[in-house]
């Protein structure tokens, strides 16, 4: 008998929210001052995927690194 073990992996956007807080930037600012998509913010809140271009845009707006936007979490 072979047991299959599923390894859960996920990308967390928690660093993004921490970076926004440190920079004093709100979702309102991103949407209405930077033209960022409210739908994309919704997707991030619900742990859904976003594009590399979106990550690039957020890094530019927030003047930060990719690790300040996303974190890879592996559930062992």
Where are these regions (language model features)?
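Short, basic-rich loop-to-helix N-cap that marks the start of a DNA-contacting helix
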Residues: 48-60
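Residues within the helices of the helix-turn-helix
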Residues: 17, 28, 42, 56, ...
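Short alpha-helical DNA-recognition segment
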Residues: 24-42
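Residue-level detection of the helix-turn-helix DNA-binding "recognition helix"
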Residues: 21, 35, 46, 74
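Alpha-helical residues within the helix-turn-helix
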Residues: 21, 32, 60
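A short, Lys/Arg-rich alpha-helix, primarily the initiator
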Residues: 1-29
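Short C-terminal boundary/hinge segments that cap the last helix of small helical domains
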Residues: 63-76
